[in-house]
């Protein structure tokens, strides 16, 4: 199977990428800087070292054949909203903009960092 629930149910390992995701992303909507900082101080399932995902990492969860949310069928995540989630990836052309991923459409988008979005923290490194 693609996903394995770990850390007493608090996290999910993606066996395809090697990344470990929060089983349930933040419920709070916040600006980019606070969202990124919150990941860095999180402890999930007794594990530290969480961080905000890059746009490429967050896109690995997307299943474009699914919509609302655009996640693989049978995924073990909870409280997934078909909303736009922050990534740690700033727009290299504009300091006030960062990349986000829409879990309604599955598309990456950009918006100002002053907007409020949810964050889905990750642990580990993406296997190439």
Model-derived features with residue positions:
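Glycine-aromatic-enriched surface loops/turns that form tight recognition elements
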Residues: 1-51, 55-128
């Amino acid at each position: 199977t693609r996903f394995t629930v770990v850390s007493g149910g608090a996290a999910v390992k993606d066996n395809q990428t090697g990344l470990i995701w929060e089983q349930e992303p933040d419920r709070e909507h916040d600006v980019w800087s606070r969202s990124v900082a919150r990941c860095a101080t999180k402890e999930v399932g007794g594990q530290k070292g969480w961080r905000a995902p890059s746009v490429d990492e967050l896109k690995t969860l997307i299943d474009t054949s699914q919509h609302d949310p655009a996640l693989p069928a049978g995924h073990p995540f909870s409280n997934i909203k078909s909303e736009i989630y922050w990534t740690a990836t700033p727009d290299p052309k504009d300091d006030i903009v960062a990349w986000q991923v829409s879990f309604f459409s599955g598309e990456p988008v950009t918006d100002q960092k002053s907007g409020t979005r949810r964050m889905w923290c990750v642990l580990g490194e993406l296997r190439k």
